[in-house]
Amino acid sequence: MTVQMLLRYGSITPEVAHVLEMLVKAKYNIFICGGTGSGKTTFLNAISNFIPHDERVITIEDSAELQIEGIDNLVSLETRNANASGNGAVTSRDLIKSSLRMRPERIVVGEVRGGEALDMLQAMNTGHDGSLSTGHANSTRDMLSRLETMVLQGADGLPLEAIRQQIASAVDVIIHLSRLRDKSRRTMEICEVLGYEEGEIQLNPIYQFVEDEHSTLEHVSGQLKRTGNPFINDYKLRLSGNREEI
């Protein structure tokens, strides 16, 4: 799946495709969320192809689904179930920890489901900018709550405030996908994570899906539209040499 195919299916607009390309190339940490069948892995695969070809990338998956093309230094790791004796299991947590010793420039985790979320966030916070992952959630705000729960599974006893601060400093952008009533898969919202303030992680919606007058019960018509909110955290964009505004 390529970005061109996402454009053809109406999941994103050309403007959004260009913004995503800028964000990936500037090494923003991006989380993609949605329900079952919303196209998270497909979307992750598509935007992963924006990663510059000369970077060292490590992918971590339960089963190899990602097909990132053109990366010369790509290492693909897969989890392994325990054998009949209950030994030999290799978890996502194991692989994320191992990958950090392999000097990656980016880490792409197919999906976080449990305690490995803590290791993923720590990797994002310790110099592995540009990392990408997906998770099950019904909205961008719900993704934050689910991340909190998953981190608690990996670090029992860590204060909730510390967890929220960790999430806010690690994740730059959250993208929410959905499978709509006509079975089409659409990008519903793109939010910037602003930081942690007054006990809450602050989100800044940049794009939101808006249905138009042509929508019916059987067919959804609409597109992602700019909210009018300015994109605040442009530090990585400027650091990458990009002077365009988002």
Where is each model-derived feature located?
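Hydrophobic anchor at the beta1->P-loop junction of P-loop NTPases
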Residues: 32
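P-loop NTP-binding catalytic core
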Residues: 1-26
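Post-Walker A helix-loop "phosphate-sensing" segment adjacent to the P-loop in P-loop NTPases
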Residues: 49-58
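Walker A (P-loop) phosphate-binding loop of P-loop NTPases
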Residues: 37
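Conserved lysine of the Walker
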Residues: 40
